[in-house]
């Protein structure tokens, strides 16, 4: 399925997150979900090529652990995973990825380059409840912004940290581009 990718800023490694399975996003259910998998690659300097791991299935982690089976369908937005230039926990700089669900958009993050994931902010209150095809990016102060497609415009929202390392903070209220002057 669609994939999103990030190259680690310090280690010669890649992280790819993709959709997988035999069901489309629109028909996915908790019982028969669109799967979420990661693959990692490291560069072999001797062979002069990238060596990929086998896919790691995170479906249960996302549906059950992170969202308590409350979201019937999830899709990691295709394109790019964002890596922080500020927050480093252990070996890796934090990565952020935008998640589409039928209950709105969320941002998830990993401090171990995709081995485990957490929700940025609330797992029950979406940062863009009516959003679709969401993207995220880190701002210069470490805050995270989302841009989410909506009918006739976009939603924007910003997560501000109270504690960067522990990922504690809150989302603002989403802004509808159609309601902004000149939007």
Q: Which residues make up each language-model segment?
A:
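Beta-rich carbohydrate-recognition and catalytic domains
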Residues: 1, 7-78, 82-183
